[in-house]
Design a protein with these regions (language model features):
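Short acidic low-complexity segments
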Residues: 31-42
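N-terminal beta1-alpha1 ligand-phosphate binding loop
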Residues: 2-24
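FMN-binding flavodoxin-like domain, especially the glycine-rich phosphate-binding loop
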Residues: 3, 23-29, 43-48, 53-135
């Protein structure tokens, strides 16, 4: 079985998951590791990782998923917000819609990534602002 790990990572969280997969799967069976690329399409099984953008995978991964036909696919992703299983399942369901029916989903995993410092600082600044009630 030849596999590929294809991922997009905006803040490094999804790359950490991709690295963990790579470290725990047979190294000699890995035909591709990296950003979306046609070279990954030679693999029978694809581990596809994404960061969440507006409730779905980022655009680069959605475009890549549409190119898959007759593959075994494992989806993994990170979300900077939320930690509930329901929220993660909703994201995964939305992403799965980009997969052609000829593919077989063999599994999925979602987790909350670390929040970037800039986002955290923005939330902290908002918290210090007085709460304005609607008129």
């Amino acid at each position: 079985m030849r596999y590929a790990i294809v991922f997009s990572s905006k803040t490094g969280n999804t790359k950490l998951l991709a690295d963990t997969l790579h470290d725990n799967l047979p190294q000699d069976a890995c035909s591709y590791f990296g950003a979306p690329d046609p070279a990954a399409l030679d693999a029978d099984t694809l581990y596809v990782g994404f960061w969440t953008d507006k409730g779905t995978a980022d655009a680069a991964i959605l475009e890549f998923l549409e190119q898959l036909h007759g593959k075994k696919v494992f989806l993994f992703g990170t979300a900077g917000f939320g930690g509930s299983e329901g929220y993660f399942n909703k994201i995964l369901k939305t992403v799965q819609k980009s997969l052609d029916r000829s593919n077989t989903l063999i599994g999925s995993f979602m987790c909350q990534g670390k929040m970037p410092l800039s986002v955290r600082q923005r939330y902290q600044a908002m918290k210090k602002q007085p709460i304005h009630m609607p008129n």
